[in-house]
Every structure is written in C-alpha cells, then in structure tokens.
Amino acid sequence: GKALVYEFAKRGAKIAMGARNLDELQKIETDLKSRGIDALSVQTDVTRELDCKNLVEKTVERFGKIDVLVNNAGISMRALFEDLELDVIRRLMDVNFWGTVYCTKFALPYILKTKGSLVGIISVAGFLGLPGRTGYSASKFAVRGFLNTLRVENLKKGLHVLVAAPGFTASNIRK
C-alpha cells in the first residue's frame, strides 16, 4: 500500500489513504505534504461498512472526485484447512473480500462519473489454490470474481477494472 501511494504521488496524484493504523497513515501524509503532494489520511477498518463509506465521503469532500480506487487491504494465513479454526476464514473474507466490496460500493458512483479505474490487489493465490492458504486463496478468488463481474456489468460505462495478482512481495500483510 505504501509503495503504491508513493508511486501515485510521484505521478502527480492527490492521495486519499485509509488504514487501521492512523499513526502510520499520518506519518505518510506528513511526508507527502512535505513533498508538495495533497494527501488525506482517514482511519479505516475495511471490515466496517461505515468506515468505508466515511473514507469515500471524506475523499470526495476534500478532492471533489475519485479517479482511482485501489483495494489493497489484506491479511493472510498459513494452516492446513483441517487444522484451521473457521473464524480465521471468516476474518480473511471480512478483510480481503468484504473490505473490497464495501469500499467499491461507496466509491463506484464517483469512479463511474470520472470514467476512472477500479483496482483490486489479489495474489497468484487468487488463480491457483496454495497449500496451507485455503482461506486466503478463497478470499482472493472471491475478489477476482467480484471485480471481473463489475467489469462486465460496466463495460459500456467507461469503467476500467484492473485485477493485479503479484507473486510474493515484501509487504506488511503478515503483520
């Protein structure tokens, strides 16, 4: 997420960021502003529908529009399904899938107005099940199906949908 923020900033974008850790967000916001980048940070738990709505509302309030939404919040897991507590899968779906659904639901009308882009960061695990990643793979398959369906539903409206599936990366997903 942080790397994406800096890449968009480097290209002149105004940045709205949402995450649970407000202190980290504010550090990034301060750094961006010191570089002349207009930035907004909003504490957001993507498992909470109202947090996602608030993030979108504050973004539109501040910038007047949304050109790109990057759904990047995610958590992972490692355990064989037979050893797994079902709450782990529920939590994975809440963050990885429902977080994408909630943020997209509230941002989509604004993205359609700008004929902008809707992005979902999934994983190679969203194409091929990985051992010990049952819940994680399921959540990423769900995001891929959701976004691909939105692409088809909005073909004639100018919506660009990108589903990015990187391999293993250096990130905070396990933290």
Where are the predicted features?
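The beta1-alpha1 cofactor-binding region of Rossmann-like NAD(H)/NADP(H)-dependent oxidoreductases
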Residues: 22, 44-54, 86
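SDR active-site lid
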Residues: 156-175
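Conserved glycine-rich Rossmann-like NAD(P)H-binding loop of the short-chain dehydrogenase/reductase
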Residues: 11-27
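Substrate-binding pocket helix/loop in short-chain dehydrogenase/reductase
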Residues: 80-81, 85-91
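Active-site helix of classical SDR
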Residues: 104, 139
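Canonical Rossmann dinucleotide-binding motif of NAD(H)/NADP(H)-dependent dehydrogenases/reductases
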Residues: 1-14
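Residue(s) in the substrate-gating loop at a strand-loop-helix junction
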Residues: 123
